[in-house]
Amino acid sequence: KEITPDYMGFEVITPDLPEKMYAGMIIGYQVSPMLGIKMDWLTEITQVKELEFFIDEQRIGPYTIWHHQHHLSPLENGVYMKDIITYQPPLGFLGAMANGLIINRKLKEIFSYRKNILEKRFGIFDPNQSRK
């Protein structure tokens, strides 16, 4: 929640999540991606390799397809994070138009916000820093 812009109204609604993530874990959210309209979003953690990566996929939500890879690499002074997202908006041609006009730009804005928050909290990635 802390790494998502406030205007998204992002809230985890699944109670009592375990400390450790596991494949098959279902997480429910409420999010307001457009015009403050709340919608449910349900994702499943489909793969986890502890301290290396995890993948979440949408089961219910705003996209036809949402596949989000979170990669982690230890560094001397922290952790390098990389997100790889594959998505498809709903509504065929109309969704493709909305993607070109709004959705893609919004996603870039959201992940830029996330990157800025993480850099403020943990420091800026130095590509010359060696990975462990």
What is each model feature region?
Residues R114:
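Substrate/cofactor-recognition hotspot
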Residues V12-P18, E119-K132:
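Short, highly charged C-terminal tails/helix-capping segments
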Residues K1-A23:
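Hydrophobic ligand-binding cavity/cleft-lining segments
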Residues M25-P33, I55-G61:
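Short beta-strand segments that buttress and anchor functional surface loops
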Residues P18-Y22, T46-F53, H71-Y80:
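A short, structured loop/turn motif at beta-sheet edges
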